[in-house]
């Protein structure tokens, strides 16, 4: 963690977990089960900027309100959201209650005064409508090439044709994983997971 800028790819709770871990002071880890040698590395981290990339917008996040709201209470970090990325507030009424509450947090982050941000050592930046297309560098990560996205009429993410780069020293992927299939067990190949209904695959067979 000797670089200034870390990029996190993903718009779910795992991305938030990573951002929080990189941002917390040693005291904020009191009571956790994190190992001491990891705390030593985090305590001496040079990270000042954390950018969370999401290929869709604020209304499509998979971040729960509690986890998102915790970003506003970090001792040495503050979240940053571009007002221009936020949809019209009237559209929030159409959202499921949990997502609506999460979007409310994003609106609160966008309203944080710059004077308050100046007192924080770390900035957690939400970059919506942004899809990484390449990680570049000479033998190490030096930058990420990002494509600007927009939503079509079906809320699918499509490219605008614009691109830009973010200088960084680390990229962390938080976009989920694909479960390997098992012979004889129903599997959804398009989604990379076992076919299930509320965790039940077959009578007597469950997944978590």
What is the meaning of each model-derived region?
Residues 2-12:
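Beta1/beta-strand and adjacent pyrophosphate-binding region of the FAD-binding site
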Residues 1, 135, 140, 152-208:
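FAD-site-proximal beta/loop scaffold in flavoenzymes
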Residues 12-14, 56, 178:
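Gly/Ser/Thr-rich beta-alpha loop segments that engage phosphate groups in nucleotides
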Residues 5, 126, 169-170:
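Short SAM/SAH-binding signature in class I
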Residues 16, 20-162, 196-197:
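Dinucleotide-binding/catalytic capping subdomain of oxidoreductase cores
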């Amino acid at each position: 963690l000797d670089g200034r800028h870390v990029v996190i790819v993903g718009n779910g709770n795992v991305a938030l977990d990573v951002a929080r871990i990189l941002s917390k002071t040693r005291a904020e880890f009191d009571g956790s089960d994190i190992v001491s040698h990891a705390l030593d590395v985090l305590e001496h981290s040079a990270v000042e900027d954390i950018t969370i990339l999401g290929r869709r917008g604020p209304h499509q996040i998979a971040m729960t309100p509690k986890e998102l709201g915790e970003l506003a209470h970090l001792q040495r970090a503050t979240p940053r959201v571009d007002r221009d990325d936020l949809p019209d507030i009237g559209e929030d009424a159409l959202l499921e209650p949990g997502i609506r509450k999460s979007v409310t947090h994003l609106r609160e982050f966008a309203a944080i005064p710059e004077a308050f941000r100046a007192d924080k050592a770390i900035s957690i930046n939400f970059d919506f409508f942004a899809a990484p297309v390449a990680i570049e560098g000479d033998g190490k990560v030096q930058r990420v090439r990002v494509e600007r996205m927009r939503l079509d009429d079906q809320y699918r993410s499509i490219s605008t044709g614009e691109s830009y780069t973010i200088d960084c020293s680390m990229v962390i992927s938080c976009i989920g994983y694909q479960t390997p299939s098992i012979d004889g067990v129903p599997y959804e190949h398009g989604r990379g997971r076992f076919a299930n209904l509320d965790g039940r695959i077959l009578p007597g067979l469950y997944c978590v």
